């Protein structure tokens, strides 16, 4: 199933609407608004992200990352001025006041590209940000997680459930999302 990116908030969905893929994401994904947090077997907190009446999207949508990537790649292929280059690896970045120069490695050799802008959208451990000496803004959690995608027949509601120290997995935490 694949749980890399899986949960997209309303604001992300609004941005995906601008790219023309919001409808595909919402129709394929699982929409949800309610989240519940438990300590052992007792619910200690809950929230409802129910959208305001004039909002077009739900609070959250769960969708496997590979579907979102598929929709974005298909949409990019339809847009003029966008060129996707597969199996190309940026190996160095030089930033100047007016431009940025990339050195790119391919199976056929190296080449350089100069651009006005560079967007480092290459993941949490971004080699591009590292080459530029940029830190990730925000919090980094060093905790280790086991993610398991399980196909099962169960009548769980489309909600986010999170347990601290659950009776079925003591001294740990568990997150349950419907996909």
Language-model segments: residues:
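Active-site-adjacent segment of FAD-dependent monooxygenases/related oxidoreductases
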Residues: 2-77, 87, 94, 164, ...
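General small-molecule cofactor/ligand-binding pocket signal
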Residues: 26, 83-85, 137
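A generic structural motif
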Residues: 38, 103-107, 151
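Conserved FAD-binding catalytic core of PHBH/FMO-like flavoproteins
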Residues: 43, 74, 117, 121-179
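Conserved SAM/SAH-binding loop
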Residues: 87-91, 106-107
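A short, glycine/Asx- and small/polar-enriched loop/turn
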Residues: 94-101
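Core beta-strand elements of the Rossmann-like FAD/NAD(P) dinucleotide-binding domain
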Residues: 108-117
């Amino acid at each position: 199933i694949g749980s890399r990116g899986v949960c997209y908030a309303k604001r992300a969905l609004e941005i995906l609407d601008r790219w023309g893929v919001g409808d595909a994401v919402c129709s394929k994904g699982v929409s949800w608004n309610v989240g519940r947090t438990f300590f052992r077997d007792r619910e200690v907190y809950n929230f409802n992200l129910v959208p305001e009446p004039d909002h077009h999207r739900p609070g959250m949508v769960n969708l496997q990352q590979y579907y979102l990537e598929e929709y974005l790649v298909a949409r990019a292929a339809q847009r003029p001025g966008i060129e996707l280059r597969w199996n190309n690896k940026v190996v160095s970045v030089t930033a100047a006041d007016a431009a940025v120069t990339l050195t790119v490695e391919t199976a056929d050799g190296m080449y350089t590209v100069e651009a006005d802008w560079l967007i480092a959208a290459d993941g949490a451990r971004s080699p591009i940000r590292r080459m530029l000496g940029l830190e990730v803004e925000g919090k980094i959690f060093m905790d280790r997680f086991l993610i398991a995608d399980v196909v099962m027949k169960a009548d769980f509601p489309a909600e986010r459930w999170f347990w601290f120290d659950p009776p079925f997995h003591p001294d740990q935490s568990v997150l349950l999302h419907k996909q």
